[in-house]
Amino acid sequence: MKKNLTWKVVVIVAVLLVFAFGIIGNPAEVKWDKEGLKTALMNRIHLGLDLRGGTHLILQVVVNDAVNAETDRAIERIKEDLANNKVTYSDITKPDAANAPERIAIKGITPDGATTLRRVSDERLPEYSFGSGPEGSYTLTMKPAQLKDLKDRAVQQAIQKIRERVDSLGVSEPVIQEHGLGDYQILVQLPGVDDPARVKEVMQSTAMLEIRQVFGGPYSKESEAAQGQMQQPDTVVLPGKSESDPGTQVFYLVARSSAVAGHDLRQARVGRDQNGGANVQFNLTRDGGVRFSQFTSAHVGDKLGVILDGKVMEVANIKSEISDSGEIEGRFTDQQASDLALILNSGALPASIKYLEERTVGPSLGMDSIRQGVRAAIIGFVAVIIFMLIYYKGAGINADLSLLLNLVILLGFMGYFGAVLTLPGIAGVILTVGMGVDSNVLIFERIREELRNGKTPPSAVEQGFGHAWLTIIDTHVTTIVSAIILFLFGTGPVKGFAVTLSFGLFANLFTAVFVSRVIFDSILNRHQRGEALSI
């Protein structure tokens, strides 16, 4: 009996120490005073947006941008293949790029050319369906399954890129996840950020870097630039800034396709121009450098434009072959250059984003929530302790010790795994305490019943735990299943509640059944034969 108790007590003490370290961290690094303990606790238990204050954003991913980019690449492949097969056509366009970017129309093609087009599309573009359009035209439409997959991937890639950018800015404990079902939205919560202007700007930039040939400009009016498109096919008009007056918008006629793009970028960093101002210097990948070298050697004397997010940042003459590096000038401040380098290094967003909702929770509101939540938890916990002592006498001490260990395990778990404590999470802690009390009540009432039936204290304890065990398991398993469902389908605060409740219930199974039983056995081991049990 004593041997069994010894190893059980050792297990309980070990669990207590392990999770106590989870709450405060390394004891050697803790200052053992009020402020030191508070600091250690706050470093381990991270507060959520509703407690700490910060910014809540909901973003809409414009997934049609990703579809347009994909169909643009498909159009380039179609043009290349038709040219290789000597098939003529009058035009290849997207009739409704804004609302149906997945549809490509090919006009002015002969029936023989259409046969070649179908063969080429089946081989090179199997994700598109071939069809007939009006007036002898033909269409290629992206299949629904591929279209949905493309949009879903755009959202997941946007989440990853936004997370990388936010992490690089030093925002601690951000929540960045998909929001809603099939709405292509992203939830972003930034605890401790009450002025999100810079973070928003960094998140929203698509960071689409391109280098294209410039055919004309700067023009003071967009219509002047558009006239050049009549003589120069496969060009677009893009806005830029006047070199003499940066506040004035001008326009350039540039090539529709780029020589190199963002995916060819290897590294971006902050540098200095000839006047000591901040600029962004970049290096290209090996493949990008080869293509850039070939392009510049073939266009010596022509103009080259550095384009960021559809705006011409800089135009320069190609004086000689350029290999794998370049600079972006834009009269940047040091902060702007640093942010642009950060964005470029994280990679381009697959689609642009729009802000649907923005809410700022002030720190004062967060502190009020903390005080009210902690006050409610303390009042409830103290009331439970007093009730258990009054109603169950000596056994109430057993229950109270189990509940205290339950809280230590729960908070230690949050410290170890970096779980974020939210206001619903505090509610989960309180509910865990309630479930712990319920487990103890089931056990104690069963022990009382066995004692009234004339059983000895050791036998009553044995029977009480034995009969209450299945009921406790049943209630906890059903509640844990509900918490798992909340975690899978809920958002930030709801997930916090589910995580806190789930682990609290696992801890409760350990404390209510194992720890409480060990305490009873220790008491009975010291009792004289025939001595009554205080319960």
Swiss-Prot record:
InterPro entries xrefs:
Acrflvin-R, SecD, SecD/SecF_arch_bac, SecD/SecF_CS, SecD_1st, SecD_SecF_C, SecD_SecF_C_bact, SecDF_P1_head
**Cellular component, GO annotation:** plasma membrane
The UniProt keywords, alphabetically, are:
Cell inner membrane, Cell membrane, Membrane, Protein transport, Translocation, Transmembrane, Transmembrane helix, Transport
State the compartments where it is located: Cell inner membrane
Q: Does the keyword Protein transport apply?
A: yes
Subcellular location, principal:
membrane
Q: How does it assemble?
A: Forms a complex with SecF. Part of the essential Sec protein translocation apparatus which comprises SecA, SecYEG and auxiliary proteins SecDF. Other proteins may also be involved.
Q: What does this protein do?
A: Part of the Sec protein translocase complex. Interacts with the SecYEG preprotein conducting channel. SecDF uses the proton motive force (PMF) to complete protein translocation after the ATP-dependent function of SecA.
Family as reported in the entry's similarity comment: Belongs to the SecD/SecF family. SecD subfamily.
Please give the name of this protein. Answer: Protein translocase subunit SecD
**Organism this protein belongs to:** Koribacter versatilis (strain Ellin345)
